[in-house]
């Protein structure tokens, strides 16, 4: 992750999936709480995103869109998306939440690399994150309800079972 002033660039490599979605969500929320206002996700090396990661990303995009109704402008840019991910975002009806860009990123002066620690979530936390992400996709675009209705029902049941074992 690269940071400077209120700018953060997060490089997503390989397959962006439910496994990395909690770390991603925690990181974005931490940066937002610290006052970062410009977010760039470098997707040049991201081969695929699953629906959970897409739901987390869309939820953050929605959160920033809502935050922009306030005084401070917050933006999220997706850099160098491959056509498959662009198509997924479009089909899920969430592409409008992001600014898209291709090419080389011009980094602000004073940019430095910042490490991020993994969250190591429990199975219950992963299940809850998956459920929340899919609910977000359905709330943003009602056309997603038939796509994810059964998934959310399964995840809700699984979450209930996990909680009852505590």
Residue map of PLM features:
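Amphipathic alpha-helical interaction surfaces in cytosolic regulatory modules
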Residues: 18-27, 33-98
């Amino acid at each position: 992750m690269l940071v400077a002033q209120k700018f953060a660039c997060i490089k997503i490599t390989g397959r962006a999936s439910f496994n990395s979605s909690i770390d991603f969500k925690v990181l974005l929320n931490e940066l937002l709480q610290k006052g970062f206002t410009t977010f760039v996700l470098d997707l040049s090396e991201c081969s695929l995103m699953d629906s959970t990661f897409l739901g987390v990303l869309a939820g953050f995009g929605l959160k920033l869109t809502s935050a922009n109704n306030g005084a401070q402008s917050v933006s999220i840019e997706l850099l160098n998306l491959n056509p498959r991910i662009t198509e997924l975002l479009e089909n899920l009806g969430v592409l409008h939440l992001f600014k898209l860009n291709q090419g080389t990123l011009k980094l602000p002066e004073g940019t430095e690399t910042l490490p991020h620690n993994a969250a190591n979530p429990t199975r219950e936390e992963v299940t809850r994150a998956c459920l929340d992400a899919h609910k977000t996709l359905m709330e943003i675009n009602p056309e997603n309800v038939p796509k994810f209705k059964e998934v959310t029902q399964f995840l809700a049941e699984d979450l209930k079972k996990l909680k009852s074992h505590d």
